Amino acid sequence: MSKLGKFFKGTRSSRARAAPSAQEALARLRETEEMLAKKQEYLENRIQRELALAKKHGSQNKRAALQALKRKKRFEKQLTQVDGTLSTIEFQREALENSHTNTEVLRNMGFAAKAMKAVHDNMDLNKIDDLMQDITEQQDIAQEISEAFSQRVQFADGFDEAELLAELEELEQEELNKKMTSLELPNVPSSSLPAQPSRKASMPSSVHRSRAASSRRAEEDDDFKQLAAWAT
């Protein structure tokens, strides 16, 4: 085995024996990102400087202009490599962050599951069923009590309500009959009618009697109307 292979094998073995924590690995990856970002900024500035030199010596010193363009190309190649490395580092950091998040979520879920199990260990399904049955029975009893209070109280007096209603109607009818009997009717004249005079002389007296009879009939009609209205 070559020395290089032994070196990497020993490195892998040492890492396996002492694996870094997720926080430590993330911290180192962020440091590497910062270093590569500074490298990018340096290379971009060098590229701009070499481009400016190439433009400056383009018409006066062609050899210096070509050397500036060569350096510019070399810096651009390095910048491309740094960009690729930085992308890989960012991807690795994001993957490690996701793995760390998933690990924390899984650990918290396991902790919650243990707590839930401890709670359920102190609970008996049979006791829960008995408790729910007791609650249902007490609710039914409370409902019956509420219905009993809301119903009308009826005393056992032994009287028939239909008979009482019939007796009440009889009393009302008797009272109505008494009121009708005590009602005063118009008096009928007891004197005999006068003898019929001769046709010629009795014309004014006949008209007078007709008017008196009409007045009595009107009074009688009024009395009967009042009686009928009272009776209804």
From Swiss-Prot:
Gene: Chmp4c
Protein task: Probable core component of the endosomal sorting required for transport complex III (ESCRT-III) which is involved in multivesicular bodies (MVBs) formation and sorting of endosomal cargo proteins into MVBs. MVBs contain intraluminal vesicles (ILVs) that are generated by invagination and scission from the limiting membrane of the endosome and mostly are delivered to lysosomes enabling degradation of membrane proteins, such as stimulated growth factor receptors, lysosomal enzymes and lipids. The MVB pathway appears to require the sequential function of ESCRT-O, -I,-II and -III complexes.
PANTHER family membership: CHARGED MULTIVESICULAR BODY PROTEIN, CHARGED MULTIVESICULAR BODY PROTEIN 4C
Biological process per Gene Ontology, one example term: regulation of mitotic spindle assembly
Name of the protein described by the UniProt record: Charged multivesicular body protein 4c
Entry GO terms, CC: amphisome membrane; autophagosome membrane; cytosol; Flemming body; kinetochore; kinetochore microtubule; lysosomal membrane; midbody
Coiled coil: 21-45, 125-185
Annotated spans, Intramolecular interaction with C-terminus: 1-153
Modified residues (Phosphoserine): S210
Domain free text: The acidic C-terminus and the basic N-terminus are thought to render the protein in a closed, soluble and inactive conformation through an autoinhibitory intramolecular interaction. The open and active conformation, which enables membrane binding and oligomerization, is achieved by interaction with other cellular binding partners, probably including other ESCRT components.
Protein keywords: Coiled coil, Cytoplasm, Endosome, Membrane, Phosphoprotein, Protein transport, Transport
PTM field: Phosphorylated at Ser-210 by AURKB during cytokinesis: together with ZFYVE19/ANCHR, phosphorylated CHMP4C retains abscission-competent VPS4 (VPS4A and/or VPS4B) at the midbody ring until abscission checkpoint signaling is terminated at late cytokinesis.
Pfam families xref list: Snf7
Compartment(s) where it occurs, according to its Swiss-Prot or TrEMBL record: Cytoplasm, Cytosol; Late endosome membrane; Midbody, Midbody ring
Source organism (scientific name): Mus musculus (Mouse)
Region entry Disordered, spans: 1-23, 177-232
Subunit text: Probable core component of the endosomal sorting required for transport complex III (ESCRT-III). ESCRT-III components are thought to multimerize to form a flat lattice on the perimeter membrane of the endosome. Several assembly forms of ESCRT-III may exist that interact and act sequentially. Self-associates. Interacts with CHMP2A. Interacts with CHMP4A. Interacts with CHMP4B. Interacts with CHMP6. Interacts with VPS4A. Interacts with PDCD6IP; the interaction is direct.
Single GO molecular function: protein homodimerization activity
